Amino acid sequence: MRIRNFNEGLVLKTIEENSSISRADIGKIVGLTPPTISAIVKDLIERDIVQEIGKGDSSGGKKPTLLKINSKAAYMVAVDLGGENGIRVALMDLSYNIVKEKFDSKIESLNSQKLKNSLSVILKDFIKEINIPKEKILSICIGVPGIIDNKLKKVTVAPYLNWEISLEDLTLKEIGIPISLENDVNLMALGEKTKGIAQKINNFVFVGERTGIGAGIIINRKIYKGANNAAGEVGYLLIDPKYAPKSTRDNGCLEKLASYKVILEKAREKMGKNIRVIDVFKMAAEEDSVALGIVKETLKFLAYGIGNISCILDPELVIIGGGISILPKKFLEEIKMNIQEIIPFVPKIEFSKLGEDGVLIGAAVKVLEPLKKKGLILINSK
């Protein structure tokens, strides 16, 4: 059975790495005999893991039947705790598509214990609602704004939200689905690497303008986390000594100058208490003078942060994501002009096209990509 599973893994991995492929071409790549390939593929089709999708081209003779992975053969659940809309939960398929999602309460209003209780209830209810067999849900991945201690499976620093959370606190053991935590901006970087504008880029930085400000650093197509999992905590960059944090638990300087919270404070003072960050960005795009002033000031400080990052990493590309990415492209020129004030070389800069979906997509990538590379998805499902 082990040999069969190993061969199955080879076949699955090969189909996954090719958008469509014939049985004969699989055999050429993995070195298995045609009868072995046919038997494995027949079993995978019967288990609804692989699909036949039509005929391919032929250089002579019978046209081959093409195969692909069934993206609905298995799923994972992605959770985003770092956006303006509160807790966002989504069911993701094997192609990193959002199948179903729901929103819940704003997490800024929840203390640590209430967050744990709320998140546990939301996840349990969501898994009931989607009505999918548990064996088809490979994992749950929670994107959080903060530093993750992987050994303790715990968020240790999340100053803007003023809470800590550990997987053990979530009381989800009875669900029977593996759960992991990851920094939300790291997940956005993974999303860009796989389904965004960095699919062909080896080294890039994703700067997330969200509840706080963070950076996901991709080096040689892999997330760089640093010795203490704190790489990319650019919210602590010192942009102006007047805004230096008073303690290590305080919000960082760049976050005090350019985060969602700061934008909201300025906007609500000048534009009304009910305005949202996304509204400010939309109004700035429409040339509203008050919103434009707030956004331009934010972009200036964000640009200084990107300039500092570029001096250290010299990335091929810097992607700016979060709600701010809905701004028109002309605002990128504003950022570049501000960077030119402080450094002699300006990196290529783009706004993300994934928006807030990047966290959910990245969570799916984090869970599924390692499994796909090993060809292990659903090998033991019957």
Residue ranges and their predicted role:
Residues M1-G61, L66-F103, E108-K136, I175, ...:
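ATP-binding/phosphotransfer module of carbohydrate and carboxylate kinases, centering on a glycine-rich
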Residues V79, G86, L138-R249, G362, ...:
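Phosphate-binding/catalytic loop of phosphoryl-transfer enzymes
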